[in-house]
A protein has these predicted regions:
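A conserved mid-domain beta-alpha-beta active-site/ligand-binding segment of alpha/beta enzyme cores
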Residues: 160-211
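A structural signal for short, hydrophobic/glycine-enriched beta-strand patches
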Residues: 1-169, 210
Length: 211
């Protein structure tokens, strides 16, 4: 067992790799990685949906990178890349994932628009948790989650370096365990080898993104 193979195993576990189909809405979860909104723009241009909601205020990580809420930063990028301004709405007050979904659900309900299907766009390693959380908020809605098409080995960059990403992977597994124990998401079986990788990485000091 080593650090990179352990991280790669967790990365693969956290991704869902769902097939996506045309939907009523693309919901973008704001975060520190602008590649997320690039994926949303790609889906919009391929006509998977003609409306986008971007959700996200200034989170604990993005506040060190952005001067404006995540949703504002992402919207500006989307418009620059060709998305019509009128096709984008933003929610810029949420600072955690549950509130991303709760506040967006209220926006949709208040608009009286009948949204039956949503494509959620997030970071690759957040696919599983995002899907489980969304299911708790968007009842009777067809949900699918997707993310930028990037493998673990190519994901780190100058802003989000390898150590940061590995810390985030460990934090994701911990959140799945804690939120399920608190009945905030449904219980899922975490394979034994993933738990071994998780514990190994914590022993190696990758604990900066733990709750």
């Amino acid at each position: 067992m080593d650090t990179l193979s352990s991280a790669k195993n967790i990365w693969d576990f956290l991704k869902i790799n769902q097939d996506i189909t045309k939907s009523d809405l693309i919901l973008v979860l704001g975060n520190s990685d602008i590649r997320t909104v690039d994926k949303a723009v790609e889906l919009y241009k391929k006509n998977y949906a003609n409306k986008i909601i971007i959700t996200g205020g200034l989170g604990r990580i993005s506040s060190d990178l952005f001067d404006e809420p995540e949703a504002v930063v992402f919207k500006n990028i989307a418009v620059q890349k060709g998305v019509k301004d009128l096709d984008i709405e933003i929610e810029s007050n949420s600072t955690n994932t549950f509130d991303n979904f709760r506040f967006t659900k209220k926006m949709i309900d208040d608009s009286k628009v009948n949204v039956k299907s949503i494509i959620i766009v997030t970071k690759p390693y957040m696919e599983k948790r995002a899907y489980l959380m969304a299911k708790e908020i968007f009842h009777n809605t067809n949900l699918a989650v997707t993310s930028p098409d990037i493998e673990f080995s190519n994901y780190p960059n100058q802003i989000l370096n390898k150590d940061f990403v590995i810390n985030m992977l460990v934090g994701e597994v911990q959140r799945l365990i804690i939120y399920a124990s608190q009945s905030e998401i449904e219980q899922i079986k975490i394979p034994k080898d993933i738990l071994q990788n998780y514990n190994y990485l914590m022993q190696k000091g990758y604990i900066k993104q733990l709750l």
